[in-house]
């Protein structure tokens, strides 16, 4: 094509160009943005840019592949889809599974939060959500598709023929790419200062810092769809090109004035030089913009700061809609934590803009704006809005508690560091700016890093380990695991015929009480299903099997005692069938239940954990609100309806690509198997999941279903425990027995238990009212008889009174009421208890500001002995022998003299 290789005069980077005048590689920070002056196709929207890209590559032999969700359900080492190549990792890139097409083209919505603090400041260089358009080619040793020359040619033709860019303005800069354990050389394609694409040639695996060439060589490209739109629209910021009319809508709703166009175009020109994490770079940026626009620096700083906040709200609200639209539930862990981080940063930006518009209104605008591009936003709109509203409520609650949380932390350690700010945000949700304000008001200033939210996001990029089908932790001794891995795959008779109760096999190996056979009917622990138990007979000896584990492809049987057998011996196996059948029922109903939850609660309901045992089943699901009794009844009704319909249940082995294309990513409710073909379990017209477990053949066999408990085990996750089959009757009998015991306890005849309990509750409420009146009477009596004679010590009243009431909670309540009505009072109630003296002491708010009762009690103990303690506004003291109220009052007054 006539390209010449050069090296940048200033940037010292190698690049290829047709232009003899270029001395730099034409991307920032080597040159300023000048693409607004480049002749090209004009005015492409994001949707038009996407379609132009996909259509071009379709015409050039690529198969269009639909995008995946922004939450990486097929990956257990990553929460979010951060690039198009993530779609094909690790199964395709490892060579285990073929790609869905080869070559292919895709436009993948992606989310990256590592630079969230820079969004808006750089006028579009950084976004949290974006579309990565890409064409991929997977070159196998026996099938080469295309490599560097064809990749560069396709990029060149797209930019010149579709976008109409003059060929001499296109630059290919040499670079190097690494990520996800792979690496390779790359070209960055830039025009007019703007990088439009990256072309990566993935050919190495990174192992201990070394590069090993891999047989599968992958063309991994990434074209920024939003950047293509920005390039063709030539607006002062990418946000104008991406969001169009929404920019003015948000500006009006947030009360942000339109900026001086001279300022915005000056910012556009030099924004590529800006390093937002460098304070000096920021200062230079504002000064340069002010100089170019002919304004003063502070005015420019104010304009660009407000604009950056407006743009960050635009960006974040779209990201929130995409995350929740794909089913993420905001929480304190996993991808839910990242969704909450974006929500709370958006709320903080609204606060900094003094905008009172609810975040949910802005998210709704975004969802409706993008519905045509992302249909899931329409399908899940009710959930999206409800979840955002709830997050706003929770954030307001955090702000109400923030001062006490931070002050408690400052008492523990005098100053806060960045790690403390991150911990306060991580564990309590306190925004760093709020924590810093509170700390500064207490004389302990702390600087919040510009990239605070980026630091937090980086700590939550993905899970620490991969679960697969759930066979990663066997609990077996290491030497046994190593021994078991020597054997090939154990034939899984429990899959071939889950109803087989007995089986004859051959011993492959024995190590102490551990046995591996050529085949087995014993199910190993995994996939949330507990192992089988039973007996084996070999060489006329019977052994009880108490555990079964899968190690690699071998299945290890664990006996109660050492097994006397040799390889080749015949082994007879019998499982505890009633136990197995109960587990099969609980496992099958779990599949029915998760599908019911997605219908009743919403598509965001996702399995977060499960366990199936003989006694019961347990399912943890993601859901943003606590479950109600009505929710439980609906779930029970739906599940029991499916049971009554006697739907067929079966398994089938399906190629991974075909399974994902036909059934979506809900097949991975129980984990993501690292396998080429998936074992799918089908519940007729109801549910499809990849699953290793054993199941009944018909939902009618489940027999019945009852949820026995439900609770919120963590933010964003609810737990259901349930029984099926015979266990429903057992549970009903247990309830009857419990009811009978309650009836005996409250002395109620059979059938009258409810009325009797209601009567007792009414009596209890009356007793509480009587107790309240009694406490009020006590407070009034003390006020009338004693307050006037309280001692005064340096502006604090001290009073001690004998108390006939010995119940400690009642005494504490009396003191609380008394000191809340007399804020400068320290009051003590003295109780005689079995010849000893118990003293409860409380201080009103004003008195507590002057003295810590814990310190006061320590002084008293030094004089009279005893033990006790406390801090702040409450303390207690216990002394052997009799101590009068007058003496206690005198001791407290003397101690006060020492303290004040």
UniProtKB/Swiss-Prot annotation:
<dbReference type="GO" id="GO:0005737">
    <property type="term" value="C:cytoplasm"/>
</dbReference>
<dbReference type="InterPro" id="IPR022429">
    <property type="entry name" value="Ala-tRNA_lgiase_arc"/>
</dbReference>
<keyword id="KW-0436">Ligase</keyword>
<dbReference type="InterPro" id="IPR012947">
    <property type="entry name" value="tRNA_SAD"/>
</dbReference>
<dbReference type="InterPro" id="IPR009000">
    <property type="entry name" value="Transl_B-barrel_sf"/>
</dbReference>
<dbReference type="GO" id="GO:0004813">
    <property type="term" value="F:alanine-tRNA ligase activity"/>
</dbReference>
<protein>
    <recommendedName>
        <fullName>Alanine--tRNA ligase</fullName>
        <ecNumber>6.1.1.7</ecNumber>
    </recommendedName>
</protein>
<dbReference type="InterPro" id="IPR050058">
    <property type="entry name" value="Ala-tRNA_ligase"/>
</dbReference>
<feature type="binding site">
    <location>
        <position position="695"/>
    </location>
    <ligand>
        <name>Zn(2+)</name>
    </ligand>
</feature>
<dbReference type="GO" id="GO:0000049">
    <property type="term" value="F:tRNA binding"/>
</dbReference>
<dbReference type="GO" id="GO:0002161">
    <property type="term" value="F:aminoacyl-tRNA deacylase activity"/>
</dbReference>
<keyword id="KW-0694">RNA-binding</keyword>
<dbReference type="GO" id="GO:0008270">
    <property type="term" value="F:zinc ion binding"/>
</dbReference>
<keyword id="KW-0030">Aminoacyl-tRNA synthetase</keyword>
<feature type="binding site">
    <location>
        <position position="591"/>
    </location>
    <ligand>
        <name>Zn(2+)</name>
    </ligand>
</feature>
<feature type="binding site">
    <location>
        <position position="691"/>
    </location>
    <ligand>
        <name>Zn(2+)</name>
    </ligand>
</feature>
<keyword id="KW-0479">Metal-binding</keyword>
<dbReference type="GO" id="GO:0006419">
    <property type="term" value="P:alanyl-tRNA aminoacylation"/>
</dbReference>
<dbReference type="InterPro" id="IPR018165">
    <property type="entry name" value="Ala-tRNA-synth_IIc_core"/>
</dbReference>
<dbReference type="Pfam" id="PF02272">
    <property type="entry name" value="DHHA1"/>
</dbReference>
<dbReference type="InterPro" id="IPR002318">
    <property type="entry name" value="Ala-tRNA-lgiase_IIc"/>
</dbReference>
<keyword id="KW-0067">ATP-binding</keyword>
<dbReference type="GO" id="GO:0005524">
    <property type="term" value="F:ATP binding"/>
</dbReference>
<dbReference type="InterPro" id="IPR045864">
    <property type="entry name" value="aa-tRNA-synth_II/BPL/LPL"/>
</dbReference>
<keyword id="KW-0547">Nucleotide-binding</keyword>
<dbReference type="InterPro" id="IPR018162">
    <property type="entry name" value="Ala-tRNA-ligase_IIc_anticod-bd"/>
</dbReference>
<comment type="function">
    <text>Catalyzes the attachment of alanine to tRNA(Ala) in a two-step reaction: alanine is first activated by ATP to form Ala-AMP and then transferred to the acceptor end of tRNA(Ala). Also edits incorrectly charged Ser-tRNA(Ala) and Gly-tRNA(Ala) via its editing domain.</text>
</comment>
<dbReference type="InterPro" id="IPR018164">
    <property type="entry name" value="Ala-tRNA-synth_IIc_N"/>
</dbReference>
<dbReference type="InterPro" id="IPR003156">
    <property type="entry name" value="DHHA1_dom"/>
</dbReference>
<dbReference type="Pfam" id="PF07973">
    <property type="entry name" value="tRNA_SAD"/>
</dbReference>
<dbReference type="InterPro" id="IPR018163">
    <property type="entry name" value="Thr/Ala-tRNA-synth_IIc_edit"/>
</dbReference>
<keyword id="KW-0862">Zinc</keyword>
<feature type="binding site">
    <location>
        <position position="587"/>
    </location>
    <ligand>
        <name>Zn(2+)</name>
    </ligand>
</feature>
<comment type="similarity">
    <text>Belongs to the class-II aminoacyl-tRNA synthetase family.</text>
</comment>
<keyword id="KW-0820">tRNA-binding</keyword>
<keyword id="KW-0648">Protein biosynthesis</keyword>
<keyword id="KW-0963">Cytoplasm</keyword>
<dbReference type="Pfam" id="PF01411">
    <property type="entry name" value="tRNA-synt_2c"/>
</dbReference>
């Amino acid at each position: 094509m006539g390209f010449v290789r050069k090296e940048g005069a200033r940037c010292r980077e190698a690049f290829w160009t047709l232009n003899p005048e270029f001395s730099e590689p034409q991307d920032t920070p080597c040159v300023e943005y000048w693409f607004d002056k480049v002749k090209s196709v004009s005015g492409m929207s994001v949707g038009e840019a996407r379609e132009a890209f996909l259509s071009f590559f379709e015409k050039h032999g690529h198969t269009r592949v639909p995008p995946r969700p922004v939450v990486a359900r097929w990956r257990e080492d990553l929460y979010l889809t951060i690039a198009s190549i993530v779609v094909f990792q690790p199964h395709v890139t490892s060579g285990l599974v073929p790609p869905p097409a080869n070559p292919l083209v895709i436009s993948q919505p992606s989310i990256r939060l590592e630079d969230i603090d820079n969004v808006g400041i750089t006028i579009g260089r950084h976004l949290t959500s974006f579309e990565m358009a890409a064409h991929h080619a997977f070159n196998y040793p026996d099938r080469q598709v295309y490599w560097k020359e064809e990749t560069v040619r396709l990029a060149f033709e797209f930019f010149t023929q579709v976008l109409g860019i003059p060929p001499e303005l296109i630059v290919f800069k040499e670079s190097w790419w690494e990520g996800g354990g792979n690496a390779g050389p790359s070209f960055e394609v830039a025009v007019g200062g703007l990088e439009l694409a990256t072309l990566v040639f993935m050919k190495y695996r990174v192992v201990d810092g070394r590069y090993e060439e891999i047989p599968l060589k992958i063309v991994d490209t990434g074209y920024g769809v939003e950047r293509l739109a920005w390039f063709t629209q030539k607006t002062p910021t990418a946000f104008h090109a991406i969001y169009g009319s929404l920019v003015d809508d948000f500006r009006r709703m947030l009360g942000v004035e339109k900026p001086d166009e001279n300022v915005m175009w000056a910012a556009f020109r030099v924004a590529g030089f800006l390093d937002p994490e460098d304070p000096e770079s920021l200062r230079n940026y504002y000064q340069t913009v002010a100089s170019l626009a002919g304004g003063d620096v502070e005015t420019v700083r104010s304009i660009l700061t407000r604009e950056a906040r407006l743009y960050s709200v635009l960006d974040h609200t779209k990201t929130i809609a995409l995350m929740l639209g794909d089913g993420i539930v905001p929480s304190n862990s996993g991808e839910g934590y990242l969704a909450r981080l974006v929500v709370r940063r958006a709320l903080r930006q609204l606060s900094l803009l003094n905008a009172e518009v609810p975040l949910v209104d802005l998210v709704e605008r975004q969802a409706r704006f993008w519905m045509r591009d992302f249909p899931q936003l329409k399908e899940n709109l009710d959930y999206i809005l409800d979840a955002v509203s709830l997050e706003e409520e929770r954030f307001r609650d955090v702000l109400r508690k923030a001062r006490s949380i931070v002050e408690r932390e400052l008492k523990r350690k005098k100053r806060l560091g960045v790690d403390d700010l991150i911990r306060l945000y991580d564990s309590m949700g306190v925004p760093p700016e709020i924590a810093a304000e509170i700390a500064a008001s207490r004389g302990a200033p702390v600087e919040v890093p510009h990239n605070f939210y980026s630091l937090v996001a980086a700590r939550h990029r993905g899970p620490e380990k991969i679960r697969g089908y759930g066979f990663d932790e066997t609990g077996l001794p290491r030497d046994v695991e190593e021994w078991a891995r020597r054997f090939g795959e154990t034939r899984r008779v429990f899959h071939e015929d889950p109803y087989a109760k007995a089986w004859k096999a051959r011993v492959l190996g024995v190590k102490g009480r551990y046995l591996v056979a050529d085949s087995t009917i014993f199910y190993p622990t995994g996939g949330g299903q507990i192992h089988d138990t039973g007996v084996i007979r070999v060489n006329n000896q019977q052994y009880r099997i108490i555990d079964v584990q899968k190690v690699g492809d071998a299945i290890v049987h664990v006996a109660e005692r050492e097994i006397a057998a040799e390889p080749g011996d015949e082994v007879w196996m019998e499982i505890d069938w009633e136990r197995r059948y109960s587990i099969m029922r609980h496992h099958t109903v779990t599949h029915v239940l998760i599908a019911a939850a997605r219908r009743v609660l919403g598509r965001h309901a996702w399995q977060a954990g499960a366990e199936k045992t003989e006694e019961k089943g347990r399912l943890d699901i993601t859901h943003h609100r606590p479950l109600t009794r009505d929710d439980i009844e609906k779930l029970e009704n739906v599940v029991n309806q499916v049971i009554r319909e006697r739907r067929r249940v079966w398994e089938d082995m399906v190629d991974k690509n075909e399974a994902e294309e036909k059934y979506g990513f809900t097949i991975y409710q129980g984990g993501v198997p690292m396998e080429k073909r998936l074992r799918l379990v089908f519940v007729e017209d109801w549910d499809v999941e990849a699953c290793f477990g054993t199941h009944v053949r018909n939902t009618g066999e489940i027999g019945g279903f009852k949820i026995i408990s439900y609770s919120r085990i963590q933010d964003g996750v609810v737990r259901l425990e349930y029984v099926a089959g015979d266990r429903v009757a057992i549970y009903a009998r247990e309830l009857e027995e419990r009811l009978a015991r309650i009836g005996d306890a409250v002395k109620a005849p059979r059938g009258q238990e409810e009325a009797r309990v209601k009567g007792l509750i009414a009596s209890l409420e009356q007793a509480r009212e009587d107790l309240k009146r009694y406490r009020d009477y006590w407070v009034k009596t003390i006020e009338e008889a004693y307050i006037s004679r309280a001692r005064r010590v340096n502006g604090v009243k001290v009073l001690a009174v004998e108390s006939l009431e010995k119940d400690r909670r009642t005494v504490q309540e009396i003191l609380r009421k008394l000191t809340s009505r007399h804020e400068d009072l320290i009051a003590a109630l003295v109780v005689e208890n079995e010849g000893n003296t118990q003293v409860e002491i409380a201080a009103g708010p004003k008195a507590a500001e002057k003295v810590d009762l814990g310190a006061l009690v320590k002084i008293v103990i030094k004089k009279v002995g005893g033990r006790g303690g406390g801090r702040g506004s409450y303390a207690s003291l216990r002394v052997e022998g009799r101590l009068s109220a007058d003496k206690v009052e005198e001791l407290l007054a003397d101690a006060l003299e020492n303290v004040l």
